[in-house]
Amino acid sequence: MEYQILKMSSCLFILLFLTPGILCICPLQCTCTERHRHVDCSGRNLTTLPPGLQENIIHLNLSYNHFTDLHNQLTPYTNLRTLDISNNRLESLPAQLPRSLWNMSAANNNIKLLDKSDTAYQWNLKYLDVSKNMLEKVVLIKNTLRSLEVLNLSSNKLWTVPTNMPSKLHIVDLSNNSLTQILPGTLINLTNLTHLYLHNNKFTFIPEQSFDQLLQLQEITLHNNRWSCDHKQNITYLLKWVMETKAHVIGTPCSKQVSSLKEQSMYPTPPGFTSSLFTMSEMQTVDTINSLSMVTQPKVTKTPKQYRGKETTFGVTLSKDTTFSSTDRAVVAYPEDTPTEMTNSHEAAAATLTIHLQDGMSSNASLTSATKSPPSPVTLSIARGMPNNFSEMPRQSTTLNLRREETTANGNTRPPSAASAWKVNASLLLMLNAVVMLAG
């Protein structure tokens, strides 16, 4: 009896001693840590899963092997958090992956298509690396990959940026592809994106509003693309966005055009004007008059008992220094009160002149004939100094020559009365006013 009890006790002891080893067995081709829940089977030339893997493993590294197909082979590992199947010969992502995955790397395989079924139930996945494959198409569905924060699709054969990318993405790497376009609305939901890598592609331009919602962006790479710097209509949006964004831009496209836009934003110029300035001195009669001088030089020729004629010269000199902005039109300085319809013609500008006359004839009243003969004919001539070339003739002058012809009196000569002198002065002023109005 005692012998049987002792025999049973030894068996129980051996069973209790071996039980932990049975529960925590590690495959011979792998190394295990963290209580055999982290399993590393990389670089063992495996083509199938090694036997003896525990179903409660949380980390599995199968990289650098010769796997070509892992469909439905990883489904039992419902606690799996990290899966590395990079550097194998897989042509597609394994079907029926456990939904517990957080991180998955499938880089450097032969995957040509990332189909919607490959990621349909990966609600917990945060990191997905499918770089260095042969991807030509990526199909994503809305409301899948809800937790995805990092998506690496670099070094593939993509020609358009994938649509329906998850809104929680922080990092998207699309570098080293053959990307040529971004479809409208592709990036509109990526409001949490902080890093976007687009270098080494074939972009020529970025469509309007493509980057407008990337408000959290911290870094973007744009170098080594085929930007159409000479097509301003297409490239203007990207250049303005580069100037205004707070993100760090690596590889600024069309640097010369960006510098030009920065200068224009710092020194804005009204439409139709250029930024150059030049000075024009005393070139135009139509301006505010700084100095107005009038010179009266009476010249009287007498014959016995008659007045043959009288000649009076009025000289008007205008001067003005003005600075103008260069435009595409001819340079003409117009006063503030010049009518709008006159500002488009050199002739209108030259004809507009205002002369203020003083009473210079009152002292010559004694020269007026007192005869009852008809009013003397008056001849007025105006010589305008409008230059044909402003740069060659900067000073402008206007000369008014007034000549009055009087008939010969046969009667006795006597000093003219004051009434006759006033009549002559009034007629002269009226005629002068009429001439100035006609000239204007």
From Swiss-Prot:
O-glycosylated in its Ser/Thr-rich repeat domain. PROSITE patterns: LRR (PS51450). Residues 1-24 form the signal peptide. A lipid is attached at S417 (GPI-anchor amidated serine). Keywords: Cell adhesion, Cell membrane, Glycoprotein, GPI-anchor, Leucine-rich repeat, Lipoprotein, Membrane, Repeat, Signal. Transmembrane segments: none annotated. Its main location: membrane. The keyword Cell membrane applies. Disulfide bonds: none annotated. It comes from the Eukaryota. It is found in: Cell membrane. Ser/Thr-rich repeats lie at residues 229-270, 271-292, 293-335, 336-377, 378-416. InterPro entries: Leu-rich_rpt (IPR001611), Leu-rich_rpt_typical-subtyp (IPR003591), LRR-bact_E3_ubiq_ligases (IPR051071), LRR_dom_sf (IPR032675), LRRNT (IPR000372). Residues 25-55 form the LRRNT domain. The keyword Signal applies. GO terms for biological process: cell adhesion; central nervous system myelination; neuron projection regeneration; regulation of collateral sprouting of intact axon in response to injury. It is a lipid-anchor; GPI-anchor. GO terms for molecular function: identical protein binding; protein homodimerization activity. Cell adhesion molecule contributing to the interactive process required for myelination in the central nervous system. Binds to RTN4R. This is Oligodendrocyte-myelin glycoprotein. It comes from Mus musculus. The lineage of its organism: Eukaryota, Metazoa, Chordata, Craniata, Vertebrata.
